[in-house]
Amino acid sequence: MLRIQALTKTYKNGEAALRGVSLSVGAGEIIGLIGPSGAGKSTLIRCVNRLIEPSSGRVQLGEVELTGLSSGALRRERRRIGMIFQEYALIERLTVMENVLAGRLGYTGFWNSWFRRFAEQDIQRAIALLERVGLIDHIDKRADALSGGQRQRVGIARALIQQPELLLVDEPTASLDPKTSRSVMRLLTELCIENRLAAIVNIHDVVLAQAFLPRIVGLNAGIVVYDGPASGLTAEVLTSIYGEEDWTRTAAGDGGTDDGEPLIIARMEAAQ
């Protein structure tokens, strides 16, 4: 479904953010991307849809190689890719409904976009999505009146209304409290399964990654150092990803209780 081959990114200052990353993601497969700060996780996600231009390598979505597309063709192909951001990227003065419908702008003509006129089927799908993410009672509320967890749910609904084939998710829980983080991750993974969506989730919390993401890819200094099941994150593997002292702090978690936590604790104890 998605194939990344020998992808590199070197910035003008000579810093190599990605060093020959190769990765395949199947239809409906959800993977977690973990690693220390500066490992290249966000760069990798942004290179997939060319928000950042890679220096070399290939990114292929289905039968289409994204790295070779013109700007016009790239805009069309980006409709197949939903993006969920850490900072939410909502339009503060617009309502929840209007922010969700913004995900359909790529399918709407200029004047309809200008006057925010959307097809009835888009409106009905937005309502259904807001019902699913638990925000139907906030449909007319402005985005700047929402909590962090609610804002992230709007971002999820906006990405899904595109009806994408792939989701790129960049630190969806970084600004959220532990309980809300688990709720958002559960919702995100459930929606991917329900819609058979492939997803790459850049996540800083190893405990959350283990609890909700069956396959983990570990990056260190722009290199893939681990690609395997969450259950394979042993102390040795985590050290190769984070370093001798850093992984225990990253994996410490929030200490809360929720579905799946006994499994998380067992994994962490086994790793130690």
Curated annotation (Swiss-Prot):
Location(s), subcellular: Cell inner membrane
Disulfide bonds: none
GO cellular component: plasma membrane
Keywords recorded for this protein, A-Z: ATP-binding, Cell inner membrane, Cell membrane, Membrane, Nucleotide-binding, Phosphonate transport, Translocase, Transport
EC number of the protein: 7.3.2.2
Binding site for ATP: G35, P36, S37, G38, A39, G40, K41, S42
KW Disulfide bond (keyword) present: no
Membrane topology: Peripheral membrane protein
Entries under Gene3D superfamilies matching the protein: P-loop containing nucleotide triphosphate hydrolases
Coiled-coil region(s): none
Recorded family membership: Belongs to the ABC transporter superfamily. Phosphonates importer (TC 3.A.1.9.1) family.
Name of protein: Phosphonates import ATP-binding protein PhnC 1
Gene: phnC1
